Amino acid sequence: RAKTADSTTIVGRNFDWENCQAMVIRCLPDNGYASVSTANLDFFGFGDDYKPEGMINRFKAVAGVYVPMDGINEKGLVVADLMAGDNEVTNQTCDTLPDLTTTTAIRLLLNRAADVQEALALLRRYNMHSDIGTAHHLFIADAAGNSVCVEWADNRMYVTETNVLNNHYLCAAKQGITSGEESNRHEAILLRWYNENNGILTAAQMADALSEAQSMPNGTYGGTQWSVVYDLHTCSATYYWQRNFAKSYPFSVR
């Protein structure tokens, strides 16, 4: 998360995974905030040739609304899901709270939260359950420039203010536990960009930072599948697909 020279808040995000298909979804709920989000279609098993065309495939596309990996809403709230530093599964079990998974939490926040504080208040009203049997943490940022990491350890929720988040824990309960050296490399690159520019970056510089911090394919691992720069004032997203930063795909919430 950084600011531009005119104090616009921007957020950059790399999604590193196996080779996959992704879909950008504009959601316009009747009783919630409009948003643009990104779904990994491989989680649904739609197949490599899937396109949201025709009645059946368009109906399938609705599933992507509820499993976003990242997104921005019309209030300038950005939420992104990242793997944390280990495989601890969160399963909170308070009898008085409804249940939520990591990805449906992102949809809830995009629909209902205008800023970081509203997002945190919403998360505290639910039992969290990890998707795909591993540890997750969420990066949440708002148009005012607030940004936090939300993590779960021993079924407790922890909140840490931060401008940069990668694939290792920040909370005191598990601080420094990491998924590997690649996460440390990414953090070093992004912190260097942030510190050398005193936290002031253009959208183009944010894209350059994401390009430098990208992951390359290795065997069955596909590396960086998409990169996105979010503008939290215009509520827009500029995507780059599979490390091709020469071609951008702009989307707006409205």
What residues fall within each predicted segment?
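Acidic, contiguous internal or C-terminal segments within carbohydrate-active enzymes
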Residues: T104-V116, L120-Y126
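C-terminal, well-structured catalytic/ligand-binding subdomain of enzymes
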Residues: A2-R58, A63-V65, D70-G71, A80-N111, ...
